């Protein structure tokens, strides 16, 4: 009774007001799984293709009717009757139907919508939570949230080069308390920014987006907020960055426009090293550009023993690219984004590779999100230990935190909030 009897896709809006794909999968037993696909702003060049209509007369060319049609007219007829309990088989069928390396024929947004909706339908049919369906009986670790409370780069209309300034409430005794600590710090930061006459408008991921004197000033404001909220920087709450360095990599150099600096790879690593020393940073994501593998190797060798070095654009959740990165000593952690690779199965394969290779995993949202909470369940399902899902504002971000609170409640004494940040 877990066979697919109907598949329906539609065009909806994401958190930026841009179209995205939503898919319903209906099973013979009568249950329905629904999923909405996220979209990124700063994207890796080797991500699976997000199909857009390129029709300037609709949504400024960003419509997704072609992807919707590919679900309804191409994918659906081929998977009617397919058993959703065979997620790997379903995903492989769609990958084979597409026949391209980057899912450019059908669109990763079309394929992923079906993949996620099918997983959710199968969980409903089994009358178990999604995290249990994906992760089995061992799914029990709640993730430490990486909360993006100051936005810059491609995520905000301000002068900060670094894209995300995050807090990690790893000193909390539970996920619920971690969310509380993060919210208190977020609201304290808002009061501080207001007092200083700075903007408290928020960026794509719900963090504040003020114009500041430097990237370092953003860190200093966050430290002040942590302390004024009653917590200890580096003890109760840590700090992490997503540099998104590919966005300011120009002609082989790194250009900090806000500070009038042009840096080599080595000089940029020197800069990060000074930040780690002065501010006790715990994690830096995409510290170098995705094509600067020599710089990545240097940063990993110099800072990898004292810092989580997360690869996002450099790996794009792709098991083949990630495998090469592991062999060449690139980073020690991987960011996991479902829509970078385009199926649930391939995402799980990449996570398994990370675990087997001693890399940490961080489950992540995209800057263009919806109310869908799939990644919250995924983080618990794979015992990732960390999740990146934005700030403590905007319902598209808060929805994931609320789902994690529900999961923690459901797990009860069986749930674990990590004592070691980098599980």
Swiss-Prot record:
The keyword Plastid does not apply. Mg(2+) binds at residues 242, 285, 312. It is found in: Cytoplasm; Secreted; Cell surface. Keywords: Cytoplasm, Glycolysis, Lyase, Magnesium, Metal-binding, Secreted. Pathway: Carbohydrate degradation; glycolysis; pyruvate from D-glyceraldehyde 3-phosphate: step 4/5. InterPro entries: Enolase, Enolase-like_C_sf, Enolase-like_N, Enolase_C, Enolase_CS, Enolase_N. Binds a second Mg(2+) ion via substrate during catalysis. Belongs to the enolase family. This is Enolase. The gene is eno.
């Amino acid at each position: 009774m877990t066979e697919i009897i109907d598949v329906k896709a539609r065009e909806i809006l994401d958190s930026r007001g841009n179209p995205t794909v939503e898919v319903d999968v209906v099973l013979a037993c009568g249950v329905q799984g629904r999923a909405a696909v996220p979209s990124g702003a700063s994207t890796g060049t080797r991500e699976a293709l997000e199909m857009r209509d390129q029709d300037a007369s609709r949504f400024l060319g960003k419509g997704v009717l072609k992807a919707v049609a590919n679900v309804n007219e191409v994918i659906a007829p081929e998977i009617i009757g397919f058993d959703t309990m065979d997620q790997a088989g379903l995903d492989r069928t769609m990958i084979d139907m597409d026949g391209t390396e980057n899912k450019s024929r059908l669109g990763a947004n079309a394929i992923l919508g079906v993949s996620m909706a099918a997983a959710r339908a199968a969980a409903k049919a089994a009358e178990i939570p999604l995290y249990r369906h994906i992760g089995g009986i061992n799914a029990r670790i709640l993730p430490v949230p990486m909360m993006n409370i100051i936005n810059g780069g491609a995520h905000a209309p301000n002068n900060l080069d670094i894209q995300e300034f995050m807090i990690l409430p790893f000193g909390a005794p539970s996920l619920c308390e971690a969310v509380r600590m993060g919210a208190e710090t977020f609201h304290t930061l808002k009061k501080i920014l207001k007092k200083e006459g700075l903007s408290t408008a928020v960026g794509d991921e719900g963090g504040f987006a003020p114009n500041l004197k430097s990237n370092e000033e953003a860190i200093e404001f966050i430290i002040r907020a942590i302390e004024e909220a009653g917590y200890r920087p580096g003890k109760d709450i840590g700090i992490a960055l997503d540099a998104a360095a590919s966005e300011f990599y120009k002609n082989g150099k790194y250009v900090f426009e806000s500070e009038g600096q042009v840096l080599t790879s080595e000089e940029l690593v020197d800069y990060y090293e000074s930040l780690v020393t002065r501010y006790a940073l715990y994690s830096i994501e995409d510290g170098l550009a995705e094509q600067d593998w020599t710089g990545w190797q240097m940063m990993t060798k110099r800072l990898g023993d004292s810092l989580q070095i997360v690869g996002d654009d450099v790996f794009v959740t792709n098991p083949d690219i990630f495998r090469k990165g592991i062999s060449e000593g690139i980073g020690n952690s991987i960011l996991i984004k479902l829509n970078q690779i385009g199926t649930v199965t391939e995402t799980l394969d990449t996570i398994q590779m990370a675990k087997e290779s001693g890399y940490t995993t961080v489950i992540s949202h995209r800057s263009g999100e919806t109310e869908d909470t799939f990644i919250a369940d995924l983080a618990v399902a794979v015992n990732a230990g960390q999740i990146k899902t934005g700030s403590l504002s905007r319902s598209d971000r808060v929805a994931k935190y609320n789902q994690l609170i529900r999961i923690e409640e459901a797990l009860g004494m069986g749930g674990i909030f990590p004592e070691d940040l980098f599980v």
